[in-house]
Amino acid sequence: MNKLENPLRDDVAGPAPRHQTTQVMVGDVAVGGGAPIVVQSMTNTDTADVEGTIKQIAALARAGSEMVRITVDREEAAAAVPHIRDGIRKLGLTTPIIGDFHYIGHKLLAEYPACAEALDKYRINPGNVGFKNKRDTQFADIVEIAIKNNKAVRIGANWGSLDQELLTKLMDENAASANPRDVRAVTREAMVQSALLSAARAEEIGLPKNKMILSAKVSAVQDLIAVYQDLASRSDYAIHLGLTEAGMGSKGIVASSAALGILLQQGIGDTIRISLTPEPGGDRTREVQVGQELLQTMGFRTFVPLVAACPGCGRTTSTTFQELARSIQDFIRDEMPEWRSRYPGVENLNVAVMGCIVNGPGESKHANIGISLPGTGETPAAPVFVDGEKFRTLRGENIAADFKALVIDYIEQRYGATPKPGAAQMVPAAE
């Protein structure tokens, strides 16, 4: 049979079953073990700047980050952590705070016990936790402090700071092999072994599996996919996904989405971070938004109402539909913090903003509420569809405001405290 003649799948399209992992509680957030995939982020403030760090953690949390990591790189930062935790809690936020430690984490956690107690999770990099004969001792020091404080730990190997002793050992063994592997393959193996050997050592010290999350980050998409596939096949630890040094703007978004999307589709990953390099003066919350959009687009979770909009073509020379799509999308994101508490389930809403008669009415009918704006040469009228039925036609200079009002009406009737049976209660205006 010609490959193009294969029958259509009759099963439900969707990702592979989730890789079964051991659930870890980070504060009050469940990671792994079948829990929803968690979106996390990281601050870029000087942690010693208590007020600045509180402000950014709050912004990230309100944008939807379910865990936030902060750098703890020196004594001033360690001393600031309890004050940051207290400030966040005073704002009514319970977002778990993760401490990111490199080189001197053992020293900071030991000398600043209030810091060790205030954090919800410690991140250890096995490539720089200690060197030569100090490595095992300093690693054990951090693990023992985690056990004492009942904290979770992420053992995070990174391509850029890989354990050089382990890498050298594997490279030497490979060179002596009758069938040597590619150097990149050996480096990937070193990444996986670094994470797994460190996890095994932590268990020997007494840290249970339900307190450990593993990651193995690289900056090349294909290598990242291979590393995490291998890591998942060889363990059942909870897994943190992320493409390190993804880059700025669209490049960073595309690279992270390509790598993480493939792994998530294969059932791999319990928590994700989109590591974007922000534009100068850019909004740090962008990485949270991208992470949410990735999970929502793939059907894993819902965070905000989806706005479908056509890309535009020669039939849509007017920018009206583009401006309306942007306006509606921004409007929804701005209102979501309030809507989330007032209208449970509103994140499942689908909105369509289309630009001409070709696909506009059809796409709008598939949405809960949609509008089809007139294309070039078409009658200057914008039909609105509600739950698949034509509801009203908008005209004039206030189409954007009128459509927003209809969206609000729909939300109030569908998701309000005493919801009416769907949007059918919305009364169409006379045409």
Curated annotation (Swiss-Prot):
Coiled coil: none annotated. Pfam families: GcpE (PF04551). Residues 1-20 are annotated as: Disordered. Residues 1-12 have a biased composition (Basic and acidic residues). It catalyses: (2E)-4-hydroxy-3-methylbut-2-enyl diphosphate + oxidized [flavodoxin] + H2O + 2 H(+) = 2-C-methyl-D-erythritol 2,4-cyclic diphosphate + reduced [flavodoxin]. [4Fe-4S] cluster binds at C310, C313, C356, E363. GO terms for molecular function: 4 iron, 4 sulfur cluster binding; 4-hydroxy-3-methylbut-2-en-1-yl diphosphate synthase activity (ferredoxin); 4-hydroxy-3-methylbut-2-enyl-diphosphate synthase activity (flavodoxin); iron ion binding. Pathway: Isoprenoid biosynthesis; isopentenyl diphosphate biosynthesis via DXP pathway; isopentenyl diphosphate from 1-deoxy-D-xylulose 5-phosphate: step 5/6. InterPro entries: Dihydropteroate_synth-like_sf, IspG_bac, IspG_bac-typ, NO2/SO3_Rdtase_4Fe4S_sf. Its cofactor is [4Fe-4S] cluster. One of its GO terms (biological process) is terpenoid biosynthetic process. Its EC number is 1.17.7.3. Binds 1 [4Fe-4S] cluster. Keywords: 4Fe-4S, Iron, Iron-sulfur, Isoprene biosynthesis, Metal-binding, Oxidoreductase. Converts 2C-methyl-D-erythritol 2,4-cyclodiphosphate (ME-2,4cPP) into 1-hydroxy-2-methyl-2-(E)-butenyl 4-diphosphate. NCBIfam families: ispG_gcpE, PRK00366.1. Belongs to the IspG family. HAMAP family: IspG. This is 4-hydroxy-3-methylbut-2-en-1-yl diphosphate synthase (flavodoxin). The gene is ispG.
